[in-house]
Amino acid sequence: MATAPRPRTSTREPEELGRRLGAWLDGRLPGAKVTNVSVPGSNGMSSETLLFDIEHPDTPLRACALRLAADPAAYTVFPTYDMPRQHRVMGLVAAYTDLPVPRVQWLEEDPGPLGAPFFVMARAEGRVPPDVMPYTYEGNWLHAATDAERGALQEASISLLARLHDQFPAGEAEFLLPEGEGSPLRRHVAAQRAYYAWVVGGLAPSPLIERAFARLEELWPADEGPAVLNWGDARIGNVVYDGFTPVAVLDWEMAAYAPREVDLGWSVYLHRFFQDLTVSFGQPGLPDFLRREDLERRYAELTGHTPRDMEFHTLYAALRHAIVMLRIAYRQAHFGEVEVPADPDGLILHHASLAAMVQGTYW
């Protein structure tokens, strides 16, 4: 999940996790040693990642990454972390599509060994567009690339989304449908309303977020379109690249059964979030990169499906991101890193953009 300046992310110590991981692994691969344990600098604020190597003559994996459900003591971003669900999604995507998804190896549902459920997968080698500071800022490899190189990365990245939506059998994703009544999109939005209610439980609600939900109803698509497997957190910050070629598609915890445009709207808006933030700090950013019109046009060319109701779907993406940002801000306050202002809308970094979307003046 994309964020602003990085707050505290965990109460766990990598060395202790490595020791406990070694004890757990010995039960599956007797005599195996866990070495080179580290936490990536881009470790997220939802599930955590631990990198390590396995030394054993018969190990199925040597360079590994472990995804561990969030530590409840760290004031979690989401109310639940379903590691078996993520593990299942990644295995299915690998089975049904040609997307470069890391091989998933072991799933541990018992929280005993490491304090929370986790799974182990192959570690991908390469580089990831940074979130902090965002790739739209000066001083990173993607910003320093040529227009042609960024164009190649953009083309390869939108192709990932197109291939996922086209190749994955939609019926195999129905297990991701939230409980309740109504269409997949109705259920998806209802789940976000429930998440928002959880975020503000006992705390100040956000008038802006509530206006955005009301605006969604006004813009609701007349034809929602068929549901497909959505990646969920569909953005280039969750892709490992070799040069400018994708070699691993990561972070499937937000995977969903929803219309194609839910993924596409997220991809469009999450880039705009970084671009707007960069411009607000006096830098030009990357104004010709990942533009909405270019992504929509190319997606239509690749899939034969013309994206529709994108005002709705980009607003929905900005709204969903706002709920996460509000939770992260309340989380920072919990750790004593920020003060909570009288107006909670001020805690949402992109409140001006979201307000413009609600008013219909952003695009």
Can you say where each PLM-predicted feature lies in the sequence?
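Catalytic-loop of the protein kinase fold
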Residues: L229-W231, I236
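Active-site activation/catalytic loop segments of kinase-like enzymes and analogous catalytic loops
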Residues: V262-T303, A317-F335
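ATP-binding pocket architecture of kinase catalytic cores
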Residues: S38-I209, L219-E224
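Helical subdomain adjoining the active site within ATP-dependent kinase catalytic cores
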Residues: H305, D309, R320-W363
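Conserved protein kinase catalytic-loop anchor
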Residues: A227-L229, V247
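Catalytic activation segment of kinase domains across protein kinase-like and atypical kinase folds
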Residues: V240-W266
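Juxta-kinase regulatory segment immediately upstream of eukaryotic protein kinase catalytic domains
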Residues: A2-V34
